[in-house]
Every structure is written in C-alpha cells, then in structure tokens.
Amino acid sequence: MEQTPLTYLKQQDEELFSAMRKELKRQRDNIELIASENFVSQAVMEAQGSVLTNKYAEGYPGRRYYGGCEFVDLAENLARDRAKAIFGAEHVNVQPHSGAQANMAVYFTILNQGDTVLGMNLSHGGHLTHGSPVNFSGVQYNFVEYGVDPETEMIDYDVVAKLAEEHKPKLIVAGASAYPRVIDFKRFREIADSVGAYLMVDMAHIAGLVAAGLHPNPVEHAHFVTTTTHKTLRGPRGGMILCKEEHAKAIDKSIFPGIQGGPLMHVIAAKAVAFAEALAPEFKDYIEQVVANAKVLGEELTARGLRIVSGGTDNHLLLVDLQPLGITGKLAEHALDEAGITVNKNTIPFDPASPFVTSGIRIGTAAMTSRGFKEAEMKQIAELIELVLKNPEDQETLTSAHKQVLALTGRFPLYPERG
C-alpha cells in the first residue's frame, strides 16, 4: 500500500483522522491572521513526529537520569548551540514546554512569594503571566502594572521609571503579547539598574524579528530572556530561556527538577530544525516581508477608515480599535471567521468592554507571509476586512467575502505534499 501522510492514523482512528483533515482544510482555505500563529516547515513537523517522542531523558545532555540518551543529547545540544548563535546568548535552556513555563522558571529562580514585580497591564498589551490576577503570577507575586500613554498608546518610559522608583520591584518584566511598537530594552535595563531590580524580557512575539535583526536584541540588556519557539520564530510550540552563564545553573535547576520532569525530545529536535532555518539568509528575507506586510496592511486599513491602535506598527502585529464602527471584538471575530478570515478578539488600551467581548481585534502577518503573501495581497485583505467589519451581520456580504478568500488562498497552496 502506498504510504502517505497520516496513512496509519487513517487506518487506526478514523474520527481523529477526519478532524485533522478538516483542520488542514481550514488552514489551507482561510486567511490566517492570528498574530501568535504560523506555518512550520515540513522538516519541523517531521522532527516533531519522529521516534524521539519515545525517549525519556530527564536531566541535561551528559547528565541524564536514564540510559540510552546519547542521540537525544545530540539533538538538544544542536538546539542549544543554534539558539546561542541566533541570539548571542551565553546560556540557553530549550526544555520549557511553553513560554508560560519559561516565565515561571525565571520567577521561581529569583523571586519569593509576595515579592514585588513590575509588569505590563494585560489589556495594554501584556500577557497573562505578567501578573494577571487569574494567573499564577498574579496570585504568587505582588505585581504592579504599567501601561501605555492614553494619547500615544505607547509605553511611557518615564512613567515606568516613576513606578519602579515608587514600588522598588525585585523584577521588571518587559515584553508583550499585543504591543505593535519597538520596545526600548536598553531603557528598561537602565530603569531596572536604578532600583536594583532584575530585568526579564519576554520576547515571545518578536523573537523572529530579533533573530533577523529587525528588532533590538534583549539579550544584550536583560538578565533573563524568555520566548516561545513558534510565532514569528516559526518553530514548534514550546518555550526557551536565554541568560548569562552566571544564572545558568539556577535556571536549569528551576526547569528540572523544579517545574518539569522529562523534556519533550521530539519537540526539542523540532526546535533545532527551526533554529537552523532561522540562521539561514532566507529567514531575514522572510521577516523583512512580515514587517513590510504589517505596515502595508495597517496603512490600507487606516485609509479605509479603521483606527489602528498607536497609529501603526513596527513589528508583525496590529491592533484594530472597533469602537468607531460600533461593533465588538467578539462580533468582528465571528463575522471574519464566517468569511474565512481568522483573527482573535483582543482588548485594547483602556478598553471599556470585558475580555470576553473586547473592543478590538489583533491581526498578524507572520502566517500568511509564510504562504507567500506580499504587499498586493495585504491590500486585498484590507479590502475584505473593511467589507466584513462594515457589514458584520449581512450573510450575503459574508458569503461573497468568503468566495474571494478562497480564490486568494487557492493561489498559495499550503502543504500540497500532504495530499
């Protein structure tokens, strides 16, 4: 019998096979604009679906608690060495299962319960693990929030400095999940030093931009840098910590045995593949196109009367304020999904709506750039978004937009070799 992707799954589990085929069709047919998503290479997927998933490897290369780890040691060392080369880090831990666990490990390394931490407000662009009261970070530690200026909708570093001086945090967290502007890590380090605080940068969203040299590198300034390995870095879903050699043992101990047991060696291998891709010259070309696409998309949406938070973007994402249109993020997400355009509802700075409803949507260009979309396609996307957002409950409009989406995505095949 001819072997094709998912041959054995189809034979053994038709229900799951059907769900996965439907998901592949959704990814192929839709315009994927969720800023935290991307399309990995076939090589990354092959590594993640490899025999390495069978191997338990508690510990670190050369210091495992199980035998037979000599070859998974090679995979982990490749991932670590490549990450060091990309970001110029002295030490890298590639074992975190997620960005949240990477953040947790840093907190556990340097903080005690109740310590004061300065982090970005979630509705202003921060992340759950930056002190949200519903997250372990907000429960275990005393987080003080900074946000953006109400006029510029950008970080006001003077305000951050005043908060740091007032509250004397043990740690300052920089980085965001929905902030479209360049972050001044040098200034953050100066603020941290002025009050004797550690600086941790969560670069999950912009790691690919940092790798390509299109955003300042936080490794030069922060005591600790955490990131996911997907998003703009275009690897498997997972996490990573970068730090100075002086913190290496403490960080490694916080990951294992601190908060994790056996690492996911198949995922670490996939990280190694993605890091090799990020070291290639083509990756910089890709990221340059991601940023160019985001700028054009923002300009086109603005020209069509939509309000972009902070007036534009310096990276891969945009925040659209829907209040002038009189619709919610929840409605916009649903309407766009009906038209085959995938986004997520998102709070905007000073949002009067709840996080379950929101007054905005977040848009990213990393995934569709991976499919080959360029400036011309961004203009078409802007036209479709305008059409849907100005007629979110008109079924005829949504159907018409969906047909145009299918025509557009059909020109840029996704994983054609998967049948």
UniProtKB/Swiss-Prot annotation:
Q: Does the keyword Nucleotide-binding apply?
A: no
| Pfam (any one) | SHMT
Keywords assigned by UniProt?
Amino-acid biosynthesis, Cytoplasm, One-carbon metabolism, Pyridoxal phosphate, Transferase
Cell compartments where the protein resides: Cytoplasm
What GO terms describe the biological role, i.e. biological process, of this protein? glycine biosynthetic process from serine; tetrahydrofolate interconversion
Q: Which Gene3D superfamilies match?
A: Aspartate Aminotransferase, domain 1, Type I PLP-dependent aspartate aminotransferase-like (Major domain)
Task: Enumerate the catalysed reactions.
Answer: (6R)-5,10-methylene-5,6,7,8-tetrahydrofolate + glycine + H2O = (6S)-5,6,7,8-tetrahydrofolate + L-serine
* Annotated residues for binding of (6S)-5,6,7,8-tetrahydrofolate: 122, 126-128, 354-356
For this UniProt entry, the molecular function terms from Gene Ontology, in alphabetical order, are: glycine hydroxymethyltransferase activity; pyridoxal phosphate binding
Tell me its EC number(s), please. Answer: 2.1.2.1
Where is the site described as Plays an important role in substrate specificity found in this chain?
230
**What is the protein's major site of localization?**
cytoplasm
Q: Name one GO cellular component term.
A: cytosol
- Which residues are recorded with the post-translational modification N6-(pyridoxal phosphate)lysine? 231
Which pathway or pathways does this protein act in? Answer: One-carbon metabolism; tetrahydrofolate interconversion; Amino-acid biosynthesis; glycine biosynthesis; glycine from L-serine: step 1/1
Residue ranges that the Swiss-Prot or TrEMBL entry lists as coiled coil: none
The family database entries (SUPFAM superfamilies) matched by this protein are listed as: PLP-dependent transferases
Named cofactor requirement(s):
pyridoxal 5'-phosphate
Q: What does the protein in this record do?
A: Catalyzes the reversible interconversion of serine and glycine with tetrahydrofolate (THF) serving as the one-carbon carrier. This reaction serves as the major source of one-carbon groups required for the biosynthesis of purines, thymidylate, methionine, and other important biomolecules. Also exhibits THF-independent aldolase activity toward beta-hydroxyamino acids, producing glycine and aldehydes, via a retro-aldol mechanism.
Q: Which family does it belong to?
A: Belongs to the SHMT family.
Return the protein name.
Serine hydroxymethyltransferase
Organism, per UniProt? Exiguobacterium sibiricum (strain DSM 17290 / CCUG 55495 / CIP 109462 / JCM 13490 / 255-15)
| Gene (UniProt) | glyA
